Structure formats: structure tokens, C-alpha cells
């Protein structure tokens, strides 16, 4: 069950959803979602330095990315076909019986910008800024500004609290993040086993 605006307000008041800084409900609250703002930190792939990324090699992923911090009021230019990681300004904490979903905003999508490739789900017990996988699917560059409303976040009620919420899950790779982080796929056991072959 997706939470309505009144349910979101109640969950914020009770602490089942925590958002820092506190949202301006008049401008950010929709009928069943909260709009979140674009942060200042971006990570981009440096295509010219590497011919490919090997997910079995952690340094391959981290070394292939460069961090860019954009001051407020300045644009981050997404060229046509570009991909970048970014995060929300808001730090979100979910109760053990709530799931979060990051969704695009129509006004942003109409510029050709998608805010997530596939990673829209935030598990119960999640805490951190939401990392977005930004892509420019259009044929023109688009200026994105830190602080602009970039995505919407919806909340769903589970039938019961999770037995092992994300923050308690062994090997949770992104708990508590405050900026976008590169993929930590190389830490997964299946890839560790492949390295041994």
C-alpha cells in the first residue's frame, strides 16, 4: 500500500520517516510522494582513461570515476548520452516496515533526463541520501542545478516489519551514505568467487 499525503505527514510526525533537512510540505509534498532536491556532488566516468570497467576489480570501478562538486547557483551540464551519479540533498531514514521508491519527475523527464537506471528501491531500515543514476537520453545538453527538485520519493507499507532491515543486513554496501558512491559490485560474493577462477 502506497502512503498518501496524510499518511506521509503522520509518518514524519511519528518518526517512522525521517528526512533531514525537514521538508517544506507546501512545496515538496504531493498526493502520494515527497519531492527531493539535487545535491552538489556528482560522479562521472572518465571514458578517455579506461577502455572498460571490470566489476571483479574494485579499483577498476573507483579509478574510472571522478568526483565533481558544483557550488549552489552553478550548473552541472549533462551532455547528450552522459551518465552521472548524484545524490539528494535530503538524508532519509525509513522504519523497518516501510519501503521507499525513487521516481522521476515528469518535468525533468521531458528534458530527456532520467534519474534512475534500475535502482529505485530503498529497503526497510534504509538511512542515507538517495543516489541517482542520471542519464541524458536526449540529443541536447541539459543544465541541472544543485537544489532543484529532481525526483519524487514514495513510501509503501509492508505487511509486517522486516526481520533484517537494511541497516542490520550483513554486507550492506551503501548504508549511511551522504554523497554518491561508486558501485561496490566487486564486494559481492559471487564476483569474489569468480576472481578465484
From Swiss-Prot:
DCTP binds at residues 105-110, 166, 177. Residues 172-197 are annotated as: Disordered. GO terms for molecular function: dCTP deaminase activity; nucleotide binding. Keywords: Hydrolase, Nucleotide metabolism, Nucleotide-binding. Residues 176-187 have a biased composition (Basic and acidic residues). SUPFAM superfamilies: dUTPase-like. It holds the Pfam family DCD. It catalyses: dCTP + H2O + H(+) = dUTP + NH4(+). It is an enzyme of class 3 (hydrolase). Its EC number is 3.5.4.13. One of its GO terms (biological process) is dUMP biosynthetic process. Pathway: Pyrimidine metabolism; dUMP biosynthesis; dUMP from dCTP (dUTP route): step 1/2. InterPro entries: dCTP_deaminase (IPR011962), dUTPase-like_sf (IPR036157), dUTPase_trimeric (IPR033704). The active site is at 133 (proton donor/acceptor). Belongs to the dCTP deaminase family. HAMAP family: dCTP_deaminase (MF_00146). Catalyzes the deamination of dCTP to dUTP. Homotrimer. NCBIfam families: dCTP_deam. This is dCTP deaminase.
Amino acid at each position: 500500500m502506497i502512503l498518501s499525503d496524510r499518511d506521509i505527514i503522520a509518518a514524519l510526525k511519528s518518526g517512522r520517516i525521517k528526512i533531514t533537512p525537514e521538508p517544506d510540505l507546501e512545496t515538496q509534498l504531493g498526493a502520494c510522494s515527497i519531492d527531493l532536491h539535487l545535491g552538489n556532488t556528482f560522479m562521472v566516468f572518465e571514458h578517455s582513461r579506461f577502455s572498460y570497467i571490470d566489476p571483479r576489480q574494485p579499483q577498476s570501478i573507483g579509478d574510472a570515476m571522478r568526483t565533481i562538486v558544483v557550488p549552489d547557483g552553478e550548473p552541472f551540464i549533462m551532455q547528450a548520452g552522459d551518465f552521472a551519479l548524484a545524490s539528494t540533498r535530503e538524508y532519509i531514514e525509513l522504519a523497518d516496515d516501510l519501503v521507499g521508491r525513487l521516481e522521476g519527475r515528469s518535468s525533468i523527464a521531458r528534458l530527456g533526463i532520467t534519474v534512475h537506471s534500475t535502482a529505485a528501491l530503498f529497503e526497510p531500515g534504509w538511512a542515507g541520501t538517495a543516489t541517482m543514476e542520471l542519464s541524458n537520453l536526449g540529443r541536447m545538453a541539459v543544465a541541472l542545478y544543485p537544489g532543484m527538485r529532481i525526483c519524487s520519493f514514495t513510501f509503501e507499507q509492508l505487511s509486517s516489519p522486516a526481520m533484517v532491515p537494511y541497516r542490520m543486513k550483513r554486507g550492506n554496501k551503501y548504508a549511511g551514505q551522504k554523497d554518491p558512491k561508486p558501485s561496490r559490485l566487486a564486494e559481492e560474493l559471487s564476483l569474489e568467487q569468480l576472481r578465484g577462477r
